[in-house]
Amino acid sequence: MNYATQMEAARKGIITREMETVARKEMVDPAKLRELIAEGRVVIPANKNHASLDPCGIGQGLRTKINVNLGVSRDCCNIGMELEKARLAIELKADAIMDLSCYGRTEEFRRRLIEMSPAAVGTVPVYDAVGFYGKELKEISAEEFLGVVEKHAQDGVDFMTIHAGINRETAARFKKNPRLTNIVSRGGSLLFAWMELNGRENPFYEYFDELLEICRKYDVTISLGDACRPGSVKDATDASQIQELIVLGELTKRAWEKDVQVMIEGPGHMPLNEIIPNMLLEKKLCHGAPFYVLGPLVTDVAPGYDHITSAIGGAIAAASGADFLCYVTPAEHLRLPTLEDMKEGIIASRIAAHAADIAKGVPGARQWDDKMSEARRNLDWQKMFELALDPEKARRYRAESQPESEDTCTMCGKMCAVRNMNRVLSGAGPDG
């Protein structure tokens, strides 16, 4: 193999096995896909050590992907439950899974997740640093932060969130421009604290070239984290967020010079009317790199329903340029999600992604809806269930409320418009 990364292969004119797989699944020309990867507009997160991976592409012209977050915390450290969540995520067709474990030594869970998961696996190495070294945050050295990155890469992690954009300049901008909710990124807040405690530059920014060497070695895709993403609609599109985005655009070019694949992470909480301009800003400032957004959540007042606030924003974001949606569950801001919370979050994100794909004209997107509409016209319940995004729920609702006649439902009964139009157009009367 005469290439280190998917990007290097693409730039050398090589169509890799991973590119062929993605092109087939996405119904796109492999040569065109290779060009987009060479330009940095599409990534295929595919660590060389992730043997169970079924590769997927993220970026321009492809189906909008969704990510599921899970992992152990100090208060909830049941590895078995988190692995069960991973199995559910795979069953519900999540495209990626991020292990956000932030308590104890996490190698066992991470390795088991990578071993079982055909979906791309991501991590945030800075979360793991404190537990891995058993030190106070202030005492962790820059070299030790990089050591955790290498450990995750060796284990087979496909993409890593690296908060390199909150450098001293970005931090100074944040201090000069007060925010309602300060820094809400967990990794961003840890690095800001480390910088303040030590009076030093962000180690991931200062040693970005060394970071790139690790990522190139294992073909880890860097997901450049948005430490200054807005945590409230009031803080959206402010000086800190835009300053960091400019830095991320500069870091993107540096990564591409080393043939390292890059995604950009984005907001966050944001009013509806600011979503489309933000998608344009990211694509402009970050040179067309794939955009990975958390939501955006379009209002702050719906705890318990943030899978809905996120799906609303996610659909608009993806229709106007975002490529990758991080799911949000009803438990957001409240607790670690349960299996049922996860399912609701995944389904909501998949709805948002699919709605955006229809708008973008992604191959195959509209055809799925046309097949469903045909099944509805024919009152073919089994076909409707097969095509449903959540077949189990559709079947359960139908079974729980049985109509008098099989060709109706309990909403309209024999006044069903679809049934009666079928009968009238075939020459029969509406009753019978």
UniProtKB/Swiss-Prot annotation:
What is this enzyme's catalytic activity, as reactions? 5-amino-1-(5-phospho-beta-D-ribosyl)imidazole + S-adenosyl-L-methionine = 4-amino-2-methyl-5-(phosphooxymethyl)pyrimidine + CO + 5'-deoxyadenosine + formate + L-methionine + 3 H(+)
Q: What is this protein called?
A: Phosphomethylpyrimidine synthase
Q: Which organism is it from?
A: Pelotomaculum thermopropionicum (strain DSM 13744 / JCM 10971 / SI)
What GO molecular function annotations does the UniProt record carry, in alphabetical order?
Answer: 4 iron, 4 sulfur cluster binding; carbon-carbon lyase activity; zinc ion binding
Return the PANTHER family for the record: PHOSPHOMETHYLPYRIMIDINE SYNTHASE, CHLOROPLASTIC, THIAMINE BIOSYNTHESIS PROTEIN THIC
Enzyme Commission number(s) from the entry: 4.1.99.17
Binding of [4Fe-4S] cluster, residues: C409, C412, C416
Keyword list, A-Z:
4Fe-4S, Iron, Iron-sulfur, Lyase, Metal-binding, S-adenosyl-L-methionine, Thiamine biosynthesis, Zinc
The gene name on file is thiC
Give cofactor(s), names only. Answer: [4Fe-4S] cluster
* UniProt xrefs under InterPro entries: ThiC, ThiC/Bza_core_dom, ThiC/BzaA/B
Q: In which pathway does it act?
A: Cofactor biosynthesis; thiamine diphosphate biosynthesis
